[in-house]
Amino acid sequence: MISLSGLTSSVESDLDMQQAMLTNKDEKVLKALERTRQLDIPDEKTMPVLMKLLEEAGGNWSYIKLDNYTALVDAIYSVEDENKQSEGSSNGNRGKNLKVIDSPATLKKTYETRSASSGSSIQVVQKQPQLSNGDRKRKYKSRIADITKGSESVKIPLVDDVGSEAVPKFTYIPHNIVYQSAYLHVSLARISDEDCCANCKGNCLSADFPCTCARETSGEYAYTKEGLLKEKFLDTCLKMKKEPDSFPKVYCKDCPLERDHDKGTYGKCDGHLIRKFIKECWRKCGCDMQCGNRVVQRGIRCQLQVYFTQEGKGWGLRTLQDLPKGTFICEYIGEILTNTELYDRNVRSSSERHTYPVTLDADWGSEKDLKDEEALCLDATICGNVARFINHRCEDANMIDIPIEIETPDRHYYHIAFFTLRDVKAMDELTWDYMIDFNDKSHPVKAFRCCCGSESCRDRKIKGSQGKSIERRKIVSAKKQQGSKEVSKKRK
């Protein structure tokens, strides 16, 4: 970590380089100076900070230019505030152990206030200067350097350029966790030789022939050697999602989604689509973690950002880099609940919960007597990852959810992974189609209006969105436009 206080002491030694950059009229430098001059920041204050950021970013301008040079402006004002504090009395400082975090993407001050009971730290968001109608004003912004708290392999910042929304309250987790009663039996002994590739070495995708783990995808790997989802597999999954009636389904005798908890009876099962799975290699396989058939297990690799949208959709997720078609983005992570636990949780909760559950129903119809502890769902309301911020978009979303088999060969439990459906440009929002039927009055998602902005929006009766923005609740289901009646009862 580099202290911003070192910027002022290094100004003289860098003057020659600064002058050279100005003399050469570097276009990128001039654009940065144009922005800071709008805020009445003199060049002699901008240049040393800019050089330090470039050094820290390895000469990469992407983060510096992000959001109209927000990182640069933040850094300049951080240096100013630090200099003022060093000149003044230390009695005015609140808290202890003042630290300056100078990440090129998100610069802010952190006051660590240690508590005897929790040892927690409190982050104080710094004021951010901006222009409004030509006038220089300061506006509060929510800015968190890494919402994952170091639990992912990449940092994922959170920003609110609108400055009107509180940071959402939830516990970030990188892996699914069992809430209470869900039956999840993960055991190497339960994985037979036919369900693993014990004789493989290194990278399975480099072998002459596909291994046993490729059996689920018709004897071919679903991934390319570049780590992307193959186009043919991706297109088939998309067709199944858009035209589910054209593909086989299985039907439950007593479907958990059609259960009336008050009467103890079951309605008719509408069928569960037999989805295409990807089976990844796992611990009993002979390959290593760099195997090309372990894409989802390696976790998030893309540069992502949680941000507050300006289209009435609340918080959203966007990419900070260009992404090719078939790129793995993240899993949908949450608590593993039984269908009954989900029903009870929704009955007890308020109507402003932030997420909807993921129903893991791909194998329900194959069971003669499906036990409640085997009818599982994922709920990211209290604990989850960045997927809880992904907004819905009708018909033309740029991501799709794919079921992934990893730890267990049965389909009571599996992973949900998101892949891009097309090339996605940096700063574009990442979206996926929840398959909501807005004409279904009993559907729980009907509680909010669709603001996706798609020309093919299925909620045509609602135009625009006004009033206070709320974080939208998310849902994905293996069924065609079906929601849990247990959830909808709570919403009535």
UniProtKB/Swiss-Prot annotation:
Q: Which GO terms describe its molecular function?
A: histone H3K9 monomethyltransferase activity; zinc ion binding
The biological processes this protein is annotated with in GO are: chromatin remodeling; methylation
Q: What sequence ranges are listed for the domain SET?
A: 302-435
Residues where Zn(2+) 4 binds: C394, C450, C452, C457
Q: Where does S-adenosyl-L-methionine bind?
A: K313, G314, W315, N391, H392, Y434
Its recorded reaction(s) are: N(6)-methyl-L-lysyl(9)-[histone H3] + S-adenosyl-L-methionine = N(6),N(6)-dimethyl-L-lysyl(9)-[histone H3] + S-adenosyl-L-homocysteine + H(+); N(6),N(6)-dimethyl-L-lysyl(9)-[histone H3] + S-adenosyl-L-methionine = N(6),N(6),N(6)-trimethyl-L-lysyl(9)-[histone H3] + S-adenosyl-L-homocysteine + H(+)
- Which positions does UniProt annotate for Zn(2+) 1 binding? C196, C197, C200, C204
Its EC number is 2.1.1.-, 2.1.1.366
Which residues does Zn(2+) 2 bind? Answer: C196, C213, C281, C285
Which domain of life does the protein's organism represent?
Answer: Eukaryota
Give me the residues that bind Zn(2+) 3, please.
C200, C281, C287, C291
Polar residues bias: start-end ranges:
113-133
Q: Name one Pfam family in it.
A: SET
Q: Which UniProt keywords apply?
A: Chromatin regulator, Chromosome, Metal-binding, Methyltransferase, Nucleus, S-adenosyl-L-methionine, Transferase, Zinc
Q: Where is this region: Disordered?
A: 112-138, 463-492
Residue ranges of every copy of the Post-SET domain listed in the record: 446-462
State its location(s).
Answer: Nucleus; Chromosome
Which residues does the UniProt record annotate as the domain Pre-SET? 196-299
Q: How does it assemble?
A: Interacts with ubiquitin.
Q: Which family does it belong to?
A: Belongs to the class V-like SAM-binding methyltransferase superfamily. Histone-lysine methyltransferase family.
Domain description from the entry? In the pre-SET domain, Cys residues bind 3 zinc ions that are arranged in a triangular cluster; some of these Cys residues contribute to the binding of two zinc ions within the cluster.
- Role played: Histone methyltransferase that converts monomethylated 'Lys-9' of histone H3 (H3K9me1) to dimethylated 'Lys-9' (H3K9me2) in the absence of bound ubiquitin, and to trimethylated 'Lys-9' (H3K9me3) in the presence of bound ubiquitin. Acts in a locus-specific manner and contributes to the transcriptional silencing of pseudogenes and transposons. H3 'Lys-9' methylation represents a specific tag for epigenetic transcriptional repression.
Q: What is this protein called?
A: Histone-lysine N-methyltransferase SUVR4
Name the source organism. Arabidopsis thaliana (Mouse-ear cress)
